[in-house]
Design a protein with these regions (language model features):
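Alpha-helical transmembrane segments
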Residues: 43-62, 127-129
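Cytosolic-side membrane-entry/anchor segment at the start of a transmembrane helix
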Residues: 1-31, 138, 142-148
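Alpha-helical transmembrane segments and their immediate juxtamembrane interface regions
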Residues: 107-108, 121-148
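Alpha-helical transmembrane segments and their membrane-interface junctions
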Residues: 98-118
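Membrane-helix interface/capping segments
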Residues: 60-85
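Alpha-helical transmembrane segments of multipass membrane proteins
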Residues: 14, 18-22, 54-62, 104, ...
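Membrane-interface helix termini and inter-helical loops of multi-pass transporters
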Residues: 28-41
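Select subsegments of transmembrane alpha-helices in polytopic membrane proteins
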Residues: 8-18, 91-102
Length: 148
């Protein structure tokens, strides 16, 4: 398995893990009555800002651990140089990710128009981001295996 494929698999699992853990913590706080997710939209803003910070720090730690383990396992200290093919794969994967995010967000607006509570839109944003990231990394794996 190539370095790029391993990196994308780590990205997919880290995105799912970070989002699931953070969502579980927030849900437990909601059940305990610490925060009211149904009516307090200020809390949603704080939740998103904290989630972004937590996600960035967790990703940095995960990437460092991944590079250390990969260097030990493959005995390669340098990361592969990004060439034209890598840039094309990233470009096509990013396009797929943007399309997915747009469709998910528009679906959230449609559900909102049909009576979904407003707090559901915040949940739709989180799900849209997670699904689009999975699509982006999955697309990269697909394009690397398929070849361009």
């Amino acid at each position: 398995m190539s370095y790029q494929e391993k990196k994308n698999i780590v990205n997919i699992f880290s995105a799912m893990l970070i989002t699931a853990i953070y969502a579980w913590i927030i849900y437990q706080k909601h059940l305990a009555g610490t925060i009211n997710l149904r009516e307090d939209f200020t809390s949603w803003g704080m939740i998103f800002l904290i989630f972004i910070g937590v996600s960035i720090v967790a990703r940095i730690v995960i990437y460092i651990i991944f590079h250390i383990i990969n260097a030990i396992a493959t005995r390669e200290t340098d990361t592969p140089v990004e060439d034209e093919r890598d840039k094309m794969v990233k470009l096509m994967s990013t396009r797929n990710s943007y399309y997915t995010f747009s469709v998910c967000v528009m679906s959230g607006f449609v559900l909102l128009a049909f009576g979904m509570p407003v707090y559901g839109m915040f949940i739709a944003f989180v799900i849209s981001g997670l699904v689009s990231e999975i699509v982006e990394n999955g697309s990269q794996i697909y394009y690397y295996r398929k070849g361009l």
